[in-house]
């Protein structure tokens, strides 16, 4: 038996000791670094045709937030398809997913050593380990037998960790794979304490029938939380129906919620199911529920109390089995005190309240999220790599993010577009000059348009143009004072939310 395998047998006991899952993964990669003398390595989970980093060594922290599509990364696709050890020629022209992301090497990886170890359980791919060295001859003496041993050991460790997670968080669920419940489509990025607590709470409530009230500032990801609750529940195979209460005109609100029959009102040319019926057997997500009128709140309360609805114009009652997840950026118990929200409805909705922390309280998650969005925009722009400069990483951590995760997403995407325009290269680095995050204004705010709207209205324009210019100026000022919150802006301007959205589109604000 080779000395390398002997070394691995020696540390197997440490890997299987009572460490946390993350500590086991980190120990695995540290051992790979020490034994193979590599510059970087990563342990990846395979989900939804993507590789998700679980642990890294020698790579920038932002890598943990990235999700690598095998369709867009030929090296990772080769590892996923091979079924055995993959050694890439040192002069391979295939782009490396870690270009610019190895901590002790700046820029594109040219000639270097690269090995991929697929992690298989019963011939099914569950993950991979990637190993890179800047020395093109670093791994020449390694035998495939030795690498297969490492791969088998890592596959067993990863499989055990996934089974333990399934037992801990999904014990009451049916037998389908936990990976089917928790996929990239509803993944919540973040390792901060606040987000770990939130994930635990989602797992606890997902498979119950309790109504959930998701609370948090604009842009924190409340819809993503609702999505996760639905997809981790027994209702995942049925519909998740979305309704933005803030953009719901009062005139059609009842029909949108409960449906109508033919002839119920002018324009009702056929029967139509409302959101409650569309979500029957599934979940209805009521976003910005705090914007509902008191009259509509009373009708919603009745549906929740009795589990049936009436279509507009119909005398019949229709039973529905619909779970409610609601979200708001208002402090609803304060709204109850102010008489703007019904106390009985508040208690019905908030059986299980969840709070999504703002990004300023999640400093350690900022770079993970930045990496996630950088990988997204890389694929959309057709680039080989998008990386964050060290100085930019420091700036992102220090900024207070009034627009939360949504602001970060917009900032990264806008910066990538600017960086691409700055250079013809397919490998770009985002630098401080690509970002405009010096002021507390959210990127949701159309600042250029706001600046233009500040100019005095000229006397030589027509009444309609002058009226439009004044309305635009007023809306932009209200948006800025409310940090981009459209619902709060509608309240300040004393407008119906739906009418405000339509007016904003006509004026070119949205």
Swiss-Prot record:
Record-linked Pfam families: GAF, Sigma54_activat
Function, in words: Required for the expression of anaerobic nitric oxide (NO) reductase, acts as a transcriptional activator for at least the norVW operon. Activation also requires sigma-54.
DNA bind region: 486-505
Entry keyword annotation includes Nucleotide-binding: yes
GO BP annotation list: phosphorelay signal transduction system
Protein name (Swiss-Prot/TrEMBL): Anaerobic nitric oxide reductase transcription regulator NorR
Annotated ranges, domain Sigma-54 factor interaction: 188-417
UniProt keyword annotation of Transcription present: yes
SUPFAM superfamilies noted in UniProt: GAF domain-like, Homeodomain-like, P-loop containing nucleoside triphosphate hydrolases
SMART domains: AAA (SM00382), GAF (SM00065)
NCBIfam families: PRK05022.1
UniProt keywords, alphabetically: ATP-binding, DNA-binding, Nucleotide-binding, Transcription, Transcription regulation
Pathway assignment: Nitrogen metabolism; nitric oxide reduction
Residues given in the record as ATP binding sites: 216-223, 279-288
Domain of life the protein comes from: Bacteria
């Amino acid at each position: 038996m080779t000395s390398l395998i002997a070394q691995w047998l020696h540390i197997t006991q440490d890997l299987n000791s009572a460490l946390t899952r993350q500590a086991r993964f980190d120990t695995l990669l540290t051992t790979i670094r020490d034994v193979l003398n590599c510059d970087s390595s990563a342990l990846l989970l395979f989900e939804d045709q993507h590789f998700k980093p679980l642990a890294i060594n020698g790579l920038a922290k932002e890598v943990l937030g990235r999700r690598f599509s095998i369709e867009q990364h030929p090296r990772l696709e080769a590892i996923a398809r091979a079924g055995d050890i993959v050694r890439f020629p040192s002069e391979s022209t295939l782009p490396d997913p870690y270009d610019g992301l190895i901590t002790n090497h700046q820029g594109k990886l040219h000639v270097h050593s690269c090995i991929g170890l697929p992690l298989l359980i019963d011939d099914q791919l569950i993950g991979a380990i990637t190993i890179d060295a800047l020395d093109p001859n670093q791994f020449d003496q390694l035998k495939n037998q030795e690498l297969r041993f490492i791969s088998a050991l890592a596959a067993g460790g990863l499989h055990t960790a996934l089974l333990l997670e399934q037992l801990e968080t999904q014990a009451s669920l049916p037998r389908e794979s936990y990976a089917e419940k928790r996929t990239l489509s509803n993944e919540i990025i973040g390792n901060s304490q606040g987000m770990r607590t939130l994930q635990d709470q989602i797992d606890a409530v997902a498979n119950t029938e309790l109504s959930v009230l998701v609370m948090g500032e604009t842009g924190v990801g409340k819809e993503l939380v609702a999505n996760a609750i639905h997809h981790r529940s027994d209702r995942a195979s049925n519909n998740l129906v979305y309704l933005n209460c803030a953009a719901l005109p009062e005139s059609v609100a009842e029909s949108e919620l409960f449906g109508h029959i033919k002839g119920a009102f002018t324009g009702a040319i056929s029967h139509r199911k409302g959101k409650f019926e569309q979500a029957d057997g599934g979940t209805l997500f009521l976003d910005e529920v705090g914007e509902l009128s008191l009259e509509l709140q009373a009708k919603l309360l009745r549906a929740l109390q009795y589990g049936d609805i009436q279509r507009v114009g119909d005398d019949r009652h229709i039973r529905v089995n619909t779970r409610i997840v609601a979200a708001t950026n208002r402090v609803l118990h304060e709204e109850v005190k102010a008489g703007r929200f019904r106390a009985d409805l508040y208690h019905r909705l908030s059986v299980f309240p969840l709070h999504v922390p703002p990004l300023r309280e999640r400093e350690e998650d900022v770079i993970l999220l930045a990496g996630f969005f950088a990988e997204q925009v890389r694929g959309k722009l057709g680039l080989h790599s998008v990386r964050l400069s060290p100085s930019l990483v420091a700036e992102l951590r220090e900024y207070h993010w009034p627009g939360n995760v949504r602001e970060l997403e917009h900032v990264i995407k806008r910066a990538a577009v600017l960086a691409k325009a700055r250079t013809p290269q397919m490998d770009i680095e985002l630098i401080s000059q690509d970002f405009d995050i010096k002021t507390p204004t959210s990127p949701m705010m159309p600042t250029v348009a706001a600046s233009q709207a500040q100019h005095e209205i000229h006397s030589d324009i027509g009444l309609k143009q002058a009226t439009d210019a004044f309305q635009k100026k007023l809306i932009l000022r209200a948006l800025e004072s409310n940090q981009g919150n459209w619902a709060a802006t509608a309240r300040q301007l004393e407008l119906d939310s739906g009418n405000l959205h339509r007016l904003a589109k006509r004026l070119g604000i949205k």
